[in-house]
Amino acid sequence: MACSKHLVLFLTILLSLAETPDSAPAHRGRGGWTLNSAGYLLGPVLHLSSKANQGRKTDSALEILDLWKAIDGLPYSRSPRMTKRSMGETFVKPRTGDLRIVDKNVPDEEATLNL
């Protein structure tokens, strides 16, 4: 009997501490700074007012919104040359000005991995 009283008391306290919709902070949409899919930092989301007589301000705001949407959809660009380099080519400084010509004294990858 004493165990059930403690259980009821414990559940009452838990329910009183539970977050209710009134005590939860209201979600106000996507505000503030955010990252797009490529990792670029974007400014706050543009909210257009409902006034129809703003003229050029509405047009420029729509242009900015279109630019943000276009930038968000761009793929992340990577240099194809950077992905094709080997470990040796990445960390070895060439003696000539041409990055494609590597010094002959540099060991190949298999020799360095087997050390």
UniProtKB/Swiss-Prot annotation:
<dbReference type="GO" id="GO:0007218">
    <property type="term" value="P:neuropeptide signaling pathway"/>
</dbReference>
<dbReference type="GO" id="GO:0005576">
    <property type="term" value="C:extracellular region"/>
</dbReference>
<dbReference type="GO" id="GO:0042595">
    <property type="term" value="P:behavioral response to starvation"/>
</dbReference>
<comment type="similarity">
    <text>Belongs to the galanin family.</text>
</comment>
<dbReference type="InterPro" id="IPR008174">
    <property type="entry name" value="Galanin"/>
</dbReference>
<dbReference type="GO" id="GO:0032098">
    <property type="term" value="P:regulation of appetite"/>
</dbReference>
<keyword id="KW-0165">Cleavage on pair of basic residues</keyword>
<dbReference type="GO" id="GO:0009725">
    <property type="term" value="P:response to hormone"/>
</dbReference>
<dbReference type="GO" id="GO:0032868">
    <property type="term" value="P:response to insulin"/>
</dbReference>
<dbReference type="Pfam" id="PF01296">
    <property type="entry name" value="Galanin"/>
</dbReference>
<keyword id="KW-0732">Signal</keyword>
<keyword id="KW-0527">Neuropeptide</keyword>
<protein>
    <recommendedName>
        <fullName>Galanin-like peptide</fullName>
    </recommendedName>
</protein>
<keyword id="KW-0372">Hormone</keyword>
<keyword id="KW-0964">Secreted</keyword>
<feature type="signal peptide">
    <location>
        <begin position="1"/>
        <end position="23"/>
    </location>
</feature>
<dbReference type="GO" id="GO:0005179">
    <property type="term" value="F:hormone activity"/>
</dbReference>
<comment type="function">
    <text>Hypothalamic neuropeptide which binds to the G-protein-coupled galanin receptors (GALR1, GALR2 and GALR3). Involved in a large number of putative physiological functions in CNS homeostatic processes, including the regulation of gonadotropin-releasing hormone secretion.</text>
</comment>
<dbReference type="InterPro" id="IPR039244">
    <property type="entry name" value="GALP"/>
</dbReference>
<feature type="propeptide">
    <location>
        <begin position="86"/>
        <end position="115"/>
    </location>
</feature>
